[in-house]
């Protein structure tokens, strides 16, 4: 259950991080889901609505009592959106609470294998969730896994690797949305896949003109 989305159009409907203003409602919603499925239910949320209403410890305890099997904490408030640094000290505090027994996953600002290992060791979380850093860069998960296991960094994906990933993404998008609409929606992803590639601008116009899978 995502109680962490800070986007205005979501929050304005009382969804996502908007539920942080009403913990009782959050608990009722969570219990309803837990009681309606045999599957394990997990929750993602934020520290609180703003700096004056940080309530993550209460939320963690009450959601645990509601029956969730794990909690992911994005270490910012809703009012922060994605600005400033995520404050993982709150995650550490939750992990140190002897009354909280469910796995706690940290989220926010993990964008490299080195930072992932540093934060895991420093804040003792049970795992991590990665969001923005994986947009257009799905290799980050394997890079982190490899770094944890060996202490070595994998080489960055080549241009060919990126092209293959874009093609696969485009095929899935076309399968899901239909070829024309799926490829139009792909336009928002090309820059992310080729972030940091100096000569990508030369090909961007061609990518934006692609309207069929055959053109890949």
Q: What kind of region is each of these model predictions?
A:
Residues 28, 36-38, 52-70, 82, ...:
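Alpha/beta catalytic cores of nucleotide-metabolism and tRNA/nucleoside-modifying enzymes
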Residues 8-26, 79-88, 152-153:
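Glycine-rich tight-turn/loop motif centered on a GG-T
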Residues 4-6, 44-50, 74-78, 107-111, ...:
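Active-site beta-loop-alpha junctions enriched in small/polar residues
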Residues 19, 45-56:
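Active-site mouth loops of central-metabolism enzymes
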Residues 5-15, 30, 34-42, 47:
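N-terminal small/glycine-rich loop or linker at the start of catalytic domains
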Residues 2-3, 63:
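Short coil-to-beta-strand
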Residues 5-6, 14-15, 77, 105, ...:
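Residue-level signal for pocket-adjacent positions within structured domains
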């Amino acid at each position: 259950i995502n109680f962490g989305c800070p986007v205005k159009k979501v929050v304005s409907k009382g969804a996502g991080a908007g539920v942080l203003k009403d913990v009782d409602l959050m608990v009722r919603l969570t219990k309803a889901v837990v009681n309606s499925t045999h599957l394990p239910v997990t929750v993602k949320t934020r520290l609180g609505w703003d700096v004056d209403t940080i309530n993550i410890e209460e939320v963690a305890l009450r959601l645990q009592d509601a029956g969730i099997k794990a909690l992911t904490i994005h270490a910012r408030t809703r009012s922060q959106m994605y600005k400033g640094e995520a404050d993982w000290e709150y995650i550490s505090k939750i992990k140190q609470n002897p009354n909280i027994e469910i796995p706690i996953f940290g989220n926010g600002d993990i964008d490299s294998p080195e930072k992932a290992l540093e934060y895991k060791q420093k804040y003792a979380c049970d795992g991590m969730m990665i969001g923005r850093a994986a947009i257009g860069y799905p290799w980050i998960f394997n890079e982190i896994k490899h770094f944890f296991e060996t202490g070595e960094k994998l080489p960055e994906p080549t241009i060919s690797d990126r092209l293959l990933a874009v093609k696969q993404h485009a095929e899935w998008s076309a399968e899901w949305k239909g070829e024309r609409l799926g490829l139009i929606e792909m336009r928002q992803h090309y820059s992310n896949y080729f972030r940091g590639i100096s000569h990508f601008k030369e090909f961007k116009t061609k990518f934006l003109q692609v309207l069929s899978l055959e053109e890949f």
